[in-house]
């Protein structure tokens, strides 16, 4: 197992950690039943009726699963 020979300084530690960045997800704006929703483009969406009851999951305009 590799073990560092010397203690790493605070500035070097923080400089190394600054490269670990999280990217913001790209959200897609959609309008469903008059409501604006934001979702990830690669996830299935829940299709609801006018009462708000979940009916099924939809992906690329096709039904993929029942809820």
From Swiss-Prot:
Lineage per the UniProt record: Bacteria, Bacillati, Actinomycetota, Actinomycetes, Micrococcales
Keyword Transit peptide: no
Record GO terms (molecular function): structural constituent of ribosome
Compositionally biased residues, Basic residues: 1-19
Official protein name in the record: Large ribosomal subunit protein bL32
Keywords linked to the UniProt accession: Ribonucleoprotein, Ribosomal protein
Top-rank taxon, per record: Bacteria
GO aspect biological process, one term: translation
Disulphide bonds in the chain: none
Organism listed in the record: Arthrobacter sp. (strain FB24)
Record region (Disordered): 1-21
Gene Ontology cellular-component terms listed: large ribosomal subunit
Claim: Ribonucleoprotein is one of the keywords in the record: yes
InterPro entries: Ribosomal_bL32, Ribosomal_zn-bd
Family per similarity comment: Belongs to the bacterial ribosomal protein bL32 family.
